[in-house]
Amino acid sequence: MRPLETEYKDWTIRVITRSTGRAWSALVEVWVPGKSGDKDARLVPYNVTSQSEKAAQETGRIAAVRFIDAEAAKG
């Protein structure tokens, strides 16, 4: 499946899933508004496995939303 790319509060979110044998994990990246490209990506802490690729995408996106909200709370 292609990476899931969405937006939240003008941030860009990309979730890249990968199979880990019987489960799925993901690499989760975000970009602040106005930034793009791999050099501007920020990695989101995410260390969860899921039973399906779709579930890995969903939980990865949830982790990104929490990360963005935490960054916004810092001011």
Task: Specify the residue positions occupied by each region the protein language model found.
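Acidic, low-complexity intrinsically disordered segments
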Residues: 40-75
